[in-house]
Regions:
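Extended, low-hydrophobicity, polar/charged segments
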Residues: 1-144
């Protein structure tokens, strides 16, 4: 990591916990979609995961990491966390709740700890990539 690079909450926490990770900056590429980001970074699109924050009927919040090219099945997700139903968190509520903005939301370093579910497809990879806490930054790390 460059010494001049701004550290996000996610990068700070991973560093503090002494976890092995690598950052990938794609700011200059102009990439937006998961496929574009994967191409800009020379990575497999299936290894790119997006962070989705939801709210259950109970009012509890849940975080899901799903392959970036897929959509979250809200019915199945609700069943996994024991809720009758869940809905995606509104964009306007994301920053106050997590400390991150839409498009730069990392599952690591949120303001509070929320139950987090990672799609089982992640297990097939040695490492996966997800948002590093700002648009243009991905973190690559293992699940162990």
């Amino acid at each position: 990591m460059k010494k001049t690079e701004e550290k996000t909450n996610a990068v700070r926490l991973l560093t503090q916990k002494k976890l092995r990770f690598q950052t990938h900056d794609y700011t200059e590429s102009g990439a937006v979609s998961a496929v574009e980001v994967a191409q800009a970074l020379g990575q497999e699109p299936l290894r790119m995961f997006k962070t989705l924050v939801t709210e259950g009927r109970s009012g509890a919040h849940y975080v899901f990491l799903v392959p970036a090219q897929t959509e979250l099945d809200l019915k199945k997700a609700a069943a996994v966390v024991g809720e009758k139903s869940i809905a995606m968190l509104k964009s306007k509520d994301l920053l106050p709740l997590t400390g991150y903005i839409h498009g730069g939301c990392s599952p690591v370093g949120m303001k509070k700890l929320f139950p987090t579910v990672i799609d089982k497809s992640a297990a097939q990879f040695d490492t996966i990539l997800f948002s590093g806490g700002r648009i243009g930054l991905q973190v690559e790390t293992g699940l162990d």
